[in-house]
Amino acid sequence: MVINYKKLNPNGFYLLKYLNDETIRFIILYGGSSSGKSYSVAQTILIQTLQDGENTLVMRKVGASILKTIYEDYKVAAIGLGISHLFKFQQNTIKCLVNGAKIDFSGLDDPEKIKGISNYKRVQLEEWSEFEHPDFKQLRKRLRGKKGQQIICTFNPISESHWIKKEFIDKDKWHDVPMTVTIAGKELPEELTKVKSVRKNAPRQILNLRTKQIEEQAPNTVIIQSTYLNNFWVVGSPDGTYGFYDEQCVADFEYDRVHDPDYY
């Protein structure tokens, strides 16, 4: 499948890279408003669904907000990629007409969805910071039974006391990784893939229950941090040939940078 790279932001290139990396269990996208997190996830999961025929579950804490938020992102993303004719958009489900795979949408207020997530290859947690820590622990334990299953989380800046900071980030060690993406054997130019940071957690020593030997597990989590400066539909593409320069949006962010740096 060929996708025009001019349809994607830097977040999208990293998502395509790590959605195809079976050593990565958790893909975390972190950044403020207008950084293109949710839309990039929608784009790349649609692409992956066409390519691998696997099912995805998209969740928010409360289901009532889904249709007007992340579900709409998927519809707009499919149209933007020129692939909407390859999907059937139903209430709470998007079905791929090419291979029968589904993208289901649900709130955590539907407890039955948590019990039956083992048949999904991917689970997306939109607005991750709205979920409680016990919610996340249940989800990560129940997503099992298939090789390469992944949880993709998007969230905005949080307080130092939030459980994501205390229980997920602070309990691991992190290191920066090169901001490089190779597609079809060709490394993309740096200006197309530059974000604020890309970090992975440290390898872990894990007991193999079959061999009773301690083995090293490769890093299983990647955190991609971006800002509005990495959204080509806010600041325009590096070469000026695609995307959109939103003068009013940029002016608003610049005002905050000068007058309200803590909020910025």
Residues of each region from the PLM?
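Phosphate/NTP-binding elements of NTP-utilizing enzymes
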Residues: 1-264
